[in-house]
């Protein structure tokens, strides 16, 4: 699913509104994912505390949103812009790429709950398309 110029503008505008809360969004989304999709805990078994408000969850949530920020900055070519992250997730971390969609959905839920007035149906569609593209870019090295 490709992003139109209108979609790109909507994503950049939404990121401008939410970026100051990115760490909180990432921590909340990752915490939700670990609770709602407990099978994802297998990737974090080396953490001593997998509870939603734990320090490792908050730290990794921040890292996730740093990746989202990178994707926003590389919105015109996320596949090329996220190649290093794709390689890391495919070859080092060995994350099932289906989990990218799961976490993307959790991020959208958190954005919608934190920014209900800004998360219009149009913004939702553009952000969903963006996260689909981001997930696809991260899965590039799995082929």
From Swiss-Prot:
A GO MF term: peroxidase activity
Tissue localization of expression: Red blood cells.
Domain Globin residue range list: 2-143
GO cellular component, as recorded: blood microparticle; haptoglobin-hemoglobin complex; hemoglobin complex
Matches recorded under InterPro entries: Globin, Globin-like_sf, Globin/Proto, Hemoglobin_a-typ, Hemoglobin_oxygen_transport, Hemoglobin_pi
Gene3D superfamilies: Globins
Subunit structure, interactors included: Hb2 is a heterotetramer of two alpha-2 chains and two beta-1 chains; Hb3 is a heterotetramer of two alpha-2 chains and two beta-2 chains.
Annotated family: Belongs to the globin family.
Name of the molecule in the record: Hemoglobin subunit alpha-2
Species lineage: Eukaryota, Metazoa, Chordata, Craniata, Vertebrata
């Amino acid at each position: 699913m490709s992003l139109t110029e209108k979609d790109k503008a909507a994503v950049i505008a939404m990121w401008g509104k939410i970026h100051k809360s990115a760490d909180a969004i990432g921590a909340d989304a990752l915490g939700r994912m670990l609770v709602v999709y407990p099978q994802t805990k297998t990737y974090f078994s080396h953490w001593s505390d997998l509870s939603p408000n734990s320090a490792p969850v908050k730290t990794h949530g921040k890292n996730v949103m740093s990746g989202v920020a990178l994707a926003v900055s590389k919105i015109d070519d996320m596949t090329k812009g996220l190649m290093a992250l794709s390689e890391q997730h495919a070859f080092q971390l060995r994350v099932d790429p289906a989990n990218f969609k799961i976490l993307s959905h959790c991020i959208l839920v958190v954005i919608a709950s934190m920014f209900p007035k800004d998360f219009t149906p149009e913004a939702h569609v553009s952000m969903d398309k963006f996260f689909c593209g981001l997930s696809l870019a991260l899965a590039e090295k799995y082929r």
